[in-house]
Amino acid sequence: MVLVVGLGNPGKTYESTRHNIGFRVIDALLERRSALNATKSTFKGELHKEGENLFLKPTTYMNLSGESALPVSTFYKPEKILVIHDDLDLPFGAIRLKRGGGNGGHNGLKSLDKLLGNDYYRLRIGIGKPPLGWEVADYVLARFSQEEEQELEERLFPHAKEAIESFLEGKMEWDRLVSRYSLKPSTPKEKV
């Protein structure tokens, strides 16, 4: 069994923000897998079960994500946990798979690390650094530009879904999975 946790903040206010990319990937994945209806909401989150796999969107705020993931993990005892989250240290358009490591100041990861330890798998989705003069909190709670939304829909979400599907199948060695599904940012289109 694999527990896939998408990080984000609950509510319409945060729906399309940079910090909610984990929720959005879970939604895109479940839509494709026909499992969009939540089966349980007793773990401070929306929990979807499909076959042997669990998909969790904590309904706590980002900095309390571990309070949702811990009881799910304790009850179901998954063999692996994959966390999907935004990453300021990667440029927009980049995707990296990683196991363990530091939290990079990400409050959702801090909460998970505190309650679960940090030996879980991660799908890091780059959102880039805030522009000069922006506070980090304002940047991660801002919406993507129209061009970025288009790239999310056409390039990043399909790639992330494919990476997660391969991870869930468990047929590919970790190093090969990391190599195959790491994604560099797209190059800017030349202006004519």
Curated annotation (Swiss-Prot):
Residues holding tRNA: 14, 61, 63, 107
Site (Discriminates between blocked and unblocked aminoacyl-tRNA): 9
Gene Ontology cellular component annotations, sorted alphabetically: cytoplasm
PROSITE patterns referenced in this protein's UniProt entry, alphabetically: PEPT_TRNA_HYDROL_1, PEPT_TRNA_HYDROL_2
InterPro entries: Pept_tRNA_hydro, Pept_tRNA_hydro_CS, Pept_tRNA_hydro_sf
Pfam families: Pept_tRNA_hydro (PF01195)
SUPFAM superfamilies the record matches: Peptidyl-tRNA hydrolase-like (SSF53178)
Localization, UniProt: Cytoplasm
Site (Stabilizes the basic form of H active site to accept a proton): residue numbering on this chain: 86
Assigned keywords, A-Z: Cytoplasm, Hydrolase, RNA-binding, tRNA-binding
Oligomer and partners: Monomer.
Family to which the UniProt record says this protein belongs: Belongs to the PTH family.
NCBIfam families in the record: pth
Annotated function: Hydrolyzes ribosome-free peptidyl-tRNAs (with 1 or more amino acids incorporated), which drop off the ribosome during protein synthesis, or as a result of ribosome stalling.
Protein name per the record: Peptidyl-tRNA hydrolase
Organism encoding this protein: Wolinella succinogenes (strain ATCC 29543 / DSM 1740 / CCUG 13145 / JCM 31913 / LMG 7466 / NCTC 11488 / FDC 602W)
Lineage, broadest ranks: Bacteria, Pseudomonadati, Campylobacterota, Epsilonproteobacteria, Campylobacterales
